Amino acid sequence: MTQFASPVLHSLLDTDAYKLHMQQAVFHHYYDVHVAAEFRCRGDDLLGIYADAIREQIQAMQHLRLQDDEYQWLSALPFFKADYLNWLREFRFNPEQVTVSNDNGKLDIRLSGPWREVILWEVPLLAVISEMVHRYRSPQADVAQALDTLESKLVDFSALTAGLDMSRFHLMDFGTRRRFSREVQETIVKRLQQESWFVGTSNYDLARRLSLTPMGTQAHEWFQAHQQISPDLANSQRAALAAWLEEYPDQLGIALTDCITMDAFLRDFGVEFASRYQGLRHDSGDPVEWGEKAIAHYKKLGIDPQSKTLVFSDNLDLRKAVELYRHFSSRVQLSFGIGTRLTCDIPQVKPLNIVIKLVECNGKPVAKLSDSPGKTICHDKAFVRALRKAFDLPHIKKAS
């Protein structure tokens, strides 16, 4: 490998917790399901010039494996089963599942294969892309600058929260996928550990090494895949919610609400689901409007909102988190997941707005119709129309 291309990743656990949580559920319920996913850059960055360097990193990823101490640590967690962990010990990334190309300056990446394997590519691959691009673009930037920025933010945060009861404020690191570098994320998390309101990280490797609580449940792909797994499209979201409870009947109970808009989600989120799930996660649309809808829904079902948790994770920074905390903290339990604004906040460094999203399940289209129109992803306009009809949604403006 060249100097710039020393391996970004050093652990199979350098990923978001929900990837392993979903992978276990797929392993037990949908072992033979096949999927395809695609990379998207939501900004105007032309990243195609990094295709060769990224391809080199992908080849290096096949050497990652679950180490014995990592296996032992996962085994001590309450929600992993022995059959899955034994399978995970043998898991290796297969670079043949990934195609990378430079399409007139645009970076094109497509993943395809068994869902149980493909599911693990997304987060580490995005972290690789982010770190490789920043290595080339911002070689002068370093950990000290990231830490200085955080310290300045924490001073502002202290002033902002002076006199405020912060006993119900809980912050999590969600910064793996778009971090400046692995080193920056670890440094930021170590500093945040000193704060009483910092409760954990979505990164399993950091959680293990820093004795933190790993955070995460499921992502959009869980709901998207059920659009083709479920025989009835209109029932697919309920099928996804029910299958999750089969795998995790009394833990990991935060449900993501915006795969097919919050309104469609709440229509499916009846009293049984609302009682059994511990709470909801916001990832698109207006957060105050969303939170008010969630609280009203719980009340309508006769459930005390104080017994539930709302997790906010959409484009948050510390200031936004405090605003939401002021608005909601007396009525519901709260957690805040901050990603890019913690792990890629360095002067003169432009964070990447990059995602990898499911586009097919068993050879058929799937879609994400979130509460932010710009986040909609699907190639097949006919399927988008069918999905909107099945969930009684108004006409879509544009799928991107």
Swiss-Prot record:
GO terms for biological process: NAD biosynthetic process via the salvage pathway. InterPro entries: N/Namide_PRibTrfase, NAPRTase_N, Nic_PRibTrfase, Nic_PRibTrfase-Fam, Nicotinate_pribotase-like_C. GO terms for molecular function: nicotinate phosphoribosyltransferase activity. Transiently phosphorylated on a His residue during the reaction cycle. Phosphorylation strongly increases the affinity for substrates and increases the rate of nicotinate D-ribonucleotide production. Dephosphorylation regenerates the low-affinity form of the enzyme, leading to product release. It holds the Pfam family NAPRTase. The modification Phosphohistidine is found at residue 220. GO terms for cellular component: cytosol. Pathway: Cofactor biosynthesis; NAD(+) biosynthesis; nicotinate D-ribonucleotide from nicotinate: step 1/1. Keywords: Ligase, Phosphoprotein, Pyridine nucleotide biosynthesis. It catalyses: nicotinate + 5-phospho-alpha-D-ribose 1-diphosphate + ATP + H2O = nicotinate beta-D-ribonucleotide + ADP + phosphate + diphosphate. The keyword Phosphoprotein applies. Its EC number is 6.3.4.21. Belongs to the NAPRTase family. Catalyzes the synthesis of beta-nicotinate D-ribonucleotide from nicotinate and 5-phospho-D-ribose 1-phosphate at the expense of ATP. This is Nicotinate phosphoribosyltransferase. It comes from Shigella boydii serotype 18 (strain CDC 3083-94 / BS512). The gene is pncB.
